[in-house]
Amino acid sequence: MMTAATTALVTGATAGLGRAVAGALAGQGMRVLVHGRDAKRAASVVDEITKSGGAARAVLADLASLQQVRELADWVNADQGAITLLVNNAGIGAGRPPYRKRQLSADGHELRFAVNYLAPALLARRLVPPLKKGAPARIVNIGSVGQAPVDLADLRMDNHYTGAEAYYRSKFALAAFTFDLAEELAGSGITVNCLHPASLMNTHMVRESLIPPMSSVATGVKAVMNLATGPDGGTVTGRYFDGMNEARAHPGTYDPVTRSRLRAVTAELLDPFLRDSGRQASR
């Protein structure tokens, strides 16, 4: 288990699973950077943690903007120096039925692909330096059992769109990225894993879809903590978990050609935000 006085960044930590994970990490003695878009909601989580004897700080960024993702990472690097855990939890679900309303991000990408995949991929890459300084360190990507291959010729889903399909594609991409990054960081002291925490937890994301919840947030927290601070997350890397158990992601996420093509497209989209900008964000 990770020791006290280490720092974790949890994205999407103002509600649902992310909020509960932030509290659990603080309860284990970690300093938690509570990410959100809304200052009041983030402050509420920080207040809740500090009143319970934990240490936390709010950090704000809209993950639909890759520039804001870069600024968040640059601030963490400059202000914290070293961190030991990144939990890429923030995400957008399928939406409300009939799931037909497509939205684009600030950068013109399909919104779920941007927030659920491009943002965590960029954040993880830009935080490699402080994670190496904090090693042994971990990256935990919150995925889903719902995964579908990405149509690289139609990333914005101009030809056919449903929120559910967009969500599944984003989680496919995140799993494939997890495996790629784990290979790249082998031997660095950073483990990278992905998990489906629990099926249809009682969260706003699930309730919005009008599907009855099937499991509790507490069940999901237990699975996340297994990889975030427990034994599994420190001994394996490049793996996919379904709850507490190692499992197999979509077969396509293991295909070398598929991953190579996705990696190339992702690199092209993220390259402008991976270059050093000379700017530091203030939080």
Spans of model-derived segments:
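A glycine-rich helix->loop->beta "capping" turn
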Residues: 52-55, 75-88, 94, 103-104
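C-terminal helical subdomain
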Residues: 211-249, 254-264, 268, 272-275
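Canonical Rossmann dinucleotide-binding motif of NAD(H)/NADP(H)-dependent dehydrogenases/reductases
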Residues: 2-33
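Conserved active-site helix of classical SDR/Rossmann-fold NAD(P)-dependent CH-OH oxidoreductases
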Residues: 23, 121, 172-179, 183, ...
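Catalytic loop of short-chain dehydrogenase/reductase
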Residues: 91-113, 132-188, 196-211
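The beta1-alpha1 cofactor-binding region of Rossmann-like NAD(H)/NADP(H)-dependent oxidoreductases
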Residues: 39-40, 59-74
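Conserved glycine-rich Rossmann-like NAD(P)H-binding loop of the short-chain dehydrogenase/reductase
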Residues: 28-44
